[in-house]
Regions:
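Conserved alpha/beta enzyme-core scaffold
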Residues: 1-523
């Protein structure tokens, strides 16, 4: 069946998953639904002990079984040790047919590949995957299905009961003996625990895993004692230098600096740039450089950011500290400065992933964004974006909040160099659609800026300002093809190994097993 972005979704997938095809961004707007009800094991005795000696005991007490769904957050990023620690014990205990539900998976989890191959893990639900897991899925080693969801889409799936989490393991930088968890106060601080809120709320059992047990009560707690069944102390939950790698530095790449300048000019010359505007940006070099250059214009024009949303880095936190931003709401911290700013600035507020981006609540923060600056592996002439599948057909990225913020913001700006190595980033059709073109307003490249024809108001504003070289998206594609030629299409097999969910739970696209790799890599 053809969906709203022109992708053919096989009936077998719709029957297998019970899903509908994507029918546009606002298909489910205003349609009431019934939230799932969590199972709660009450604690009434005042002598109840939540402490367990190890992960093995936690699994036994949580009634671990074949076919269960276990969940994790990814706030420790490439420094995460919790996922592999727990899955190794599950493997050792002989459990099979596990569904692994994580807010994201990366190279830190490469050790899970043998568990995929032997049937310990049969389904994966994640924002996306990087590293060897993505390669394994793309080559058909996962026996079930990989379901890629946005951050908001994951919250929706768990709250509606589509994903039922049997045991949630929440890595906590600090925790007390009764389960009050914080992203701060330990030796592996990650700032916030936003992605784990929904797991703590909805899972049958919740296990806090910490390497820093502190005195009761560990307050303020992001995840409190009323949600946690057991507490397990281990030697190490993360590698600090891989959790937050220090201050993000502005890029010295001249191509990225040029795109950053174009992006800054686009923001500064469109109607939403006025005192009190709201803004979110990514963590790439061009995005960071754009935030820094935008701050200079804000100072010159005495314009203050009313709200910054993130995924946060040092430059955004500096805007807050300098008084150029009034408030930051935080779902993830990407460097040490952002981590520390959580507690050092009283106007820096942790929020849940649901508050941030869920499409199925009564209004998420993404809906109040004026601007969002995003990156993309590919953008096509319909303004569709691909952030998950590489040009070689291998799953190599994650949706993250890309579809959520792109739909929510009044002005969605996507930055992409015209060429990624020898591969055109602007093309006729993306390999896989993750964010629909109806969500994307402006594409910024090093060869010019294209405005979606859906937004004549933005095009007129930029024409009037004469601040950036304007091109059509087709012109940008043609320039790319004239330099490196039109790329060959990846040869996929028939088997579907994954689905790309739209944030409302409908099917945006499918990912097929790679038949022939072109050995073209995104640089």
């Amino acid at each position: 069946m053809l969906n709203a972005v022109g992708r053919e979704i096989p009936e077998e997938i719709l029957e297998r998953t019970g899903k509908e095809v994507f029918q546009g961004n606002n298909y489910k707007d205003g349609k009431a639904f019934q939230k799932a009800s969590p199972k709660v094991t009450p604690v009434m005795r005042n002598d109840h002990d939540k402490m367990v000696k190890d992960i093995h005991e936690a699994l036994v007490k949580c009634n671990a079984h074949d076919g269960m769904t276990v969940s994790f957050h990814h706030h420790f990023r490439e420094g995460d040790l919790v996922v592999c620690m727990v899955m190794e014990e599950i493997h050792k205990m002989g459990f099979k047919n596990i569904t692994l539900s994580a807010s994201s998976l990366g190279k830190a989890h490469d050790a899970l590949v043998p568990m995929i191959e032997d049937g310990t893990i049969v389904n994966i639900e994640s924002s996306g995957v990087r590293g060897k897991i993505g390669d394994a899925i793309s080559h058909g080693k996962l026996k079930g299905l990989a379901t890629m969801r946005s951050h908001g889409g994951r919250v929706r799936a768990i709250e509606t009961g589509e994903t039922h989490v049997d045991i949630a393991f929440i890595g906590a930088p600090s925790c007390d003996e009764y389960g009050n968890c914080s992203g701060m106060g330990g030796k592996t601080n990650c700032g916030v625990l936003s992605y784990a809120y929904v797991d703590a709320e909805m899972a049958d059992y919740v296990v806090a895993v910490t390497d820093c047990l502190v005195d009761y009560p560990n307050y303020p707690a992001e995840i409190n004692q009323t949600k946690v069944d057991y507490v397990c102390v281990v030697d190490q939950i993360g590698i600090p230098e891989k959790i937050a790698t220090g201050a993000a530095k502005p890029t010295t790449d001249q191509r990225k600096i040029l795109m950053a300048e174009y992006c800054t000019q686009v923001v500064a010359n469109t109607p939403y740039f006025k005192d009190g505007f709201s803004y979110q940006t990514g963590v790439g070099g061009a995005s960071i450089a754009s935030t820094i250059s935008l701050s200079k214009i804000m100072e010159e024009k005495n314009i203050h950011m009313g709200l910054g949303v993130g995924g946060l880095t040092k430059p955004m936190c500096e805007l807050l500290d300098r008084g150029l931003a009034r408030k930051l709401v935080d779902t993830q911290d990407f460097d040490l400065d952002a981590v520390n700013n959580v507690t050092s600035n009283p106007n820096h507020f942790p929020i849940s992933a649901g508050e941030y981006a869920s499409p199925m609540n009564k209004g998420a923060f993404v809906n109040k964004l004026d601007y969002v600056i995003l990156a993309s592996l590919e953008v096509d002439t319909h303004f569709n974006c691909n952030v998950v599948v590489g040009s070689d057909g291998i799953i190599t990225g994650a949706q993250g909040g890309h579809p959520d913020t792109a739909q929510g913001a009044k002005c969605t700006i996507v930055i992409a160099p015209l060429l990624q190595g020898r591969i055109p980033a602007i093309c006729t059709d993306v390999t896989t659609v993750t964010t629909p073109g109806e969500s994307v307003d402006i594409v910024v490249t090093d060869y010019g800026v294209a405005v979606n024809p859906r937004r004549p108001d933005l095009l007129e504003a930029l024409k009037a300002a004469d601040c950036v070289p304007l091109k059509t998206i087709e012109e940008l594609r043609d320039i790319a093809y004239s330099i490196v030629g039109e790329p060959e299409k990846v040869q996929f097999g028939d088997r579907i190994v994954g689905i790309i969910e739209a944030r409302d739970g409908t099917v945006m696209d499918v990912v097929r097993e790679v038949k022939l790799s072109l050995s073209a890599k995104i640089e």
